[in-house]
């Protein structure tokens, strides 16, 4: 949460740091994108597009004219909720080998929510804990993969295609866990 008297940027920025002189230090900084808030995760898709997760949305950025600035911004998934704690929203982006995007969604403090894909698919809940979802790279075919987490993040696939996630708990509980995620789990 930004303090009331914060004098920095009003929104989050994604920046590119280049070492154009090859001396080991960045000497050129370019703002690739700015405008989101509570930006939680980024991941490059196999085609080079940058997928970004914020507390309440996932969108896809592309630089179509090679100027190191995002000039295309496509919505993928939207979260509708009154929950606003930034660290238990959408996060944990990972791509499988079959053209699907997987992502986590924290327990949202038990507040009701609706997750909406680009094809209108709407999945609703509240109070069941955190979830892992998948959709295609355009935000269609949204589905719940597994449920019952606190705050699943750090999703990754191994070479055999098995999905893993880190699930963190509230600070007063035992440490984070590395979990093997199975469909319907």
Enumerate the predicted regions with their spans.
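Beta-propeller domains with acidic blade repeats across secreted/periplasmic ectodomains
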Residues: 1-185
């Amino acid at each position: 949460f930004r303090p009331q008297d914060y004098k920095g940027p009003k929104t989050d920025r994604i920046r590119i740091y280049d070492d154009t002189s090859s001396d080991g230090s960045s000497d050129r900084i370019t703002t690739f994108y700015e405008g989101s808030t509570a930006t939680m995760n980024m991941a490059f898709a196999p085609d080079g597009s940058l997928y970004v997760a914020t507390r309440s949305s996932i969108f896809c950025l592309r630089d179509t004219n090679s100027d190191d600035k995002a000039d295309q911004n496509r919505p993928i998934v939207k979260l509708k909720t009154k929950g606003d704690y930034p660290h238990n929203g959408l996060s944990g982006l990972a791509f499988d080998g079959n053209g699907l995007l997987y992502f986590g969604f924290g327990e949202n403090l038990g507040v009701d929510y609706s997750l909406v894909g680009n094809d209108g698919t709407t999945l609703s809940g509240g109070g069941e804990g955190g979830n892992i979802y998948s959709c295609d790279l355009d935000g269609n075919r949204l589905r719940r993969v597994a449920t019952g987490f606190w705050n699943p993040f750090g999703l990754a696939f191994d070479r055999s295609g098995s999905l893993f996630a880190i699930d963190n708990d509230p600070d007063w509980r035992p440490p984070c866990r590395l979990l093997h995620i199975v469909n319907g789990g």
